[in-house]
Amino acid sequence: MNNKFFKLIFYLALLLSCTPSFGAKWKAKHVVFIGLDGWGAYSMEKANMPTVKQLMKDGSYTLEKRSVLPSSSAVNWASMFMGAGPELHGYTEWGSKTPELPSRVLSHYGIFPSIWGLFRDANPQAEIGFFCQWNGLEYLAEMKAMSKEMHVKAEDDPSGKADKAVATHSCAYIERKETSFRRHFL
């Protein structure tokens, strides 16, 4: 019995010595956050979107996210950015520019804390680009935390398409800057 026990311990120790360190943490060099407003996860299975599917395969994503109520753009984007529901951040309407309810907490940027301000505070030298098509997003993020922010319009691209303009300006920015956290919305 003792012989089997020692063999088990030996092989377990050998196995553990061959694995990477449990304490080692992988850190991404860059983070790109892409949000698509109004896109239902139910469409993914039949969608012919090889680029998006490749990004999903190589990155991190969820198809399980549910809308907060009321299900409108500003309320849901605020909830994703801020990691809290409307009862805490206070945004309750589609085009909210300021919270309809008083925010439970305010960051030093003057709005409920979000990933953008928290990331900037943790990484003061980081390059953070913020490009969006819908100008309503500008009220839901700490714009003073951004290195570059741009509300892109359809006329900003020769194609006349706003989503193409967001991609064009975002790519140009990424090529010019060594960005840490990028946010692009189509």
Label every PLM stretch briefly.
Residues H89, S107-F112, P124, G136-L186:
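Catalytic-adjacent loop/helix segments of enzymes that bind and process anionic phosphate/sulfate esters
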Residues M1-F10:
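Bacterial N-terminal signal peptides that target proteins for export
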Residues S21-G23:
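Boundary at the C-terminal end of the N-terminal hydrophobic targeting segment
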